[in-house]
Amino acid sequence: MRRTDLLSSAGSQAATNEAGNKVVTVDRRTHVTWQDVTPEGYFNRVRTLDLDSGAWSEICTLGSAYDDHARAVMVADGDGFLHAILSGHNTPCTYRRSLRANDAAGWTDPVPVADGTYPYLVCGPGGDLFLTLRNAERWNGVELLTKPHDGPWRHVGKVIERLADYPGYAAFHCGFCFGADRVLHLVSDFYEGFGVWEERGVHQAVAYLQSPDGGRTWRTFRGEPAATPARPCAMDVICQSTGLRHEPMPPPVLAAQGNIALDSAGVPHVLYLYHLNRAGELILASPDESGIWRQRSIDASLRSAYPKHRAMFCRGTFTVDADGVFRALVTLVPAGHSGWDGHLPTRPGLRGIAGGRVPAADPEADNPVMWLISRDRGATFTVREAFPAAAEARSPKYELPVSGVPWPGGRGILYFDRTSRPVPGTREDPGFQNRVYFCRETAW
């Protein structure tokens, strides 16, 4: 049975974007966070669904936001308290904790953590919080911070560093998780170039590291020490490409976007999109018994079911459950869409699909969202529709196993649509409002 509820009619043009977790279930309550935009500015919100009654709480405002990049991520600890990081955009990120366990109605005062963007938050062993942020000083790499269960936030160190040869814009989208042995497994994208508005993305890579001690020291999967801040040459490189691109500010031609998951044996699996061979290739990478990373395309069933579409987005929507079932939530775009330049994604054509404003009548709007599901450890995948194109779902997110409470699986999907209504009563252009929905699916 499916049920879709409207949470807000004022979601920003990036209301649910990026890889960090936005859905948290504790016992019989599900808490969700997203970003609104109003004439007064951007605001991060939270609401709670009572799974027994089906009733939603009133909207609670976590805080104002610098812009549409400054969205919130949220987890729960083992006692059920909620923890939220309110992102900045190369500006201060702040931390808040719920005043009561499993209750999003009241929060502690905001505490500055660090300047940065694109937070990824995990509740680790013993209830300690772990956070990665892109560095705010000209996008210079990735910082790791931690908050002990009963202590303040502290800076652990810089994990990833931008190469000085690439002084321009840089992005490093991370995802990480802990195994039962307390080993931290991290995947990071690299997107570096020479300029801010041109010659972007000259160097792109997806690479992996692990840490046995909460980020103090790092190593490859085979145990080779890796000095940090690290470059791909010291990491397990899963894929990499260097060269001038097809446009000045291209979307990534390869990216994991935080997609890392562990199976029951503690083996990491990384899912990434790769457009250099053909549009929308989905590749699953996993180390074998000798520690060598093996890779295979997994989108054959998707291309067979939707031959006129290609995979474009899979941002922080990949998991492996306790039964060994692999799941990925993938957004498709027609092969002939203006979002493609041949087999490569193009920024002008993607406006309105990932976020931003959508034309009032978009003849190309045909973006179904699909589940890719494997019940044989990733050997084969089946396809199941999550949303038809008519739902106009953008940036769908389901719950990730990053909290300190048992993970219920992805039984609900948070997303925003293509409303793109100008914010009323404003002279300047603060953004566009969209409807934000939560779709609850009981047949997981």
Regions of interest found by a model, annotated:
Residues 1-444:
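Extracellular, repeat-based ectodomains that mediate carbohydrate processing or recognition
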